[in-house]
Design a protein with these regions (language model features):
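Short strand-loop junctions, especially beta-strand C-caps/beta-turns
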Residues: 30, 114-116, 215-219
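Solvent-exposed beta-strand motifs enriched in subsets of small alpha/beta binding domains
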Residues: 199-246
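Short secondary-structure junction motifs
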Residues: 68, 144-146, 237
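Basic/polar, cationic surfaces and motifs that engage anionic cell-wall
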Residues: 1-7, 15-21, 102-109, 114-206, ...
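A general secondary-structure signal for short beta-strands and their flanking turns/coil
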Residues: 66, 106, 209-211
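Sec/Tat-exported extracytoplasmic proteins
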Residues: 29-31, 138-142, 189, 232-236
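N-terminal catalytic cores of peptidoglycan-degrading enzymes
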Residues: 1-104, 174, 218
Length: 246
């Protein structure tokens, strides 16, 4: 896990600064095909990259809306995956809306995963793992069980959130669900999740199944590697790629 911090101090929610004792975590996804953290977190800190539209959430009311979450998970400018804390954990966020029984804003830490096209398995695996590790870390420091982690659509069913589908529209596309997510968070808690150091990558002894990749060859000349890549793609492996090694 890589955890950075850029508090959205210009957001109205942050300025309001209402205290909150976390009793759970609510997982969201952004609902737009843009995996880049800079779309939501800003200004550029040297890692995020420049948002030329300036439409990040570090403004009073992003897009005219009263919205803010405690963390975003997505892609850095260099292509790496990271989590960004954007509100103090024990401050009320504006992420859940309201249901028949109230609002999870008063009880739950809100985490947004930046969506892509929803079809990239490698991106999904990376942000899924990052989210599980962040949730396990938060469960440990606040003494929460893995069962306290829900998504927005589950919050709606419980009557504590507005009617949204996230993340139930995305996870099943990759063989996952909130049930498997909570199980992975529970396993991370059981092995003793390592608290993160801001600005550093933390290697977690994770029991979450790894993704296994196949290398077909290594060549001293790029042309030879490219020729093999073309043969592999012609055979139907359209997601094959070249990577320069040493």
């Amino acid at each position: 896990m890589r955890l950075e911090r850029l508090i959205l101090t210009e957001n109205e929610c942050c300025k309001t600064a209402k205290p909150m004792t976390p009793r759970g975590i609510m997982l969201h996804s952004t609902g737009a095909d843009n995996p880049n953290l800079r779309r939501y977190v800003g200004p550029d800190d040297g890692l995020l990259g420049y948002n030329r539209f300036g439409n990040h959430w570090n403004t009073l009311r992003p897009g005219g809306r009263q919205v803010c979450v405690h963390a975003f998970i997505g892609r850095l400018a260099d292509g790496g995956i990271a989590s960004y804390q954007t509100l103090p954990w024990q401050q009320r966020g504006w992420h859940a809306g309201r249901g028949k029984k109230g609002s999870a804003n008063a009880t739950h830490i809100g985490i947004e995963i930046c969506e892509d096209s929803l079809s990239d398995g490698l991106y999904f695996d990376s942000v899924y793992r990052e989210a599980a590790e962040l949730c396990a870390y938060l469960c440990i420091i606040f003494g929460l069980p893995a069962e306290s982690v829900i998504c927005h659509s589950e919050g709606y069913a419980l009557g504590i959130a507005s009617n949204h589908a996230d993340v139930s529209h995305w996870f099943p596309r990759h063989g996952k669900s909130m049930g498997t997510f909570r199980a992975d968070v529970a396993r991370l808690i059981s092995v003793g999740h390592i608290p993160p150091v801001f600005g550093a990558v933390v290697n977690v002894p994770s029991p979450i199944p790894q993704v296994w990749r196949v290398q077909l060859g290594a060549f001293s000349k790029r042309d030879n590697a490219a020729a093999l890549l073309e043969r592999v793609k012609n055979a139907g492996f359209s997601d094959a790629f070249l990577i320069r090694g040493s």
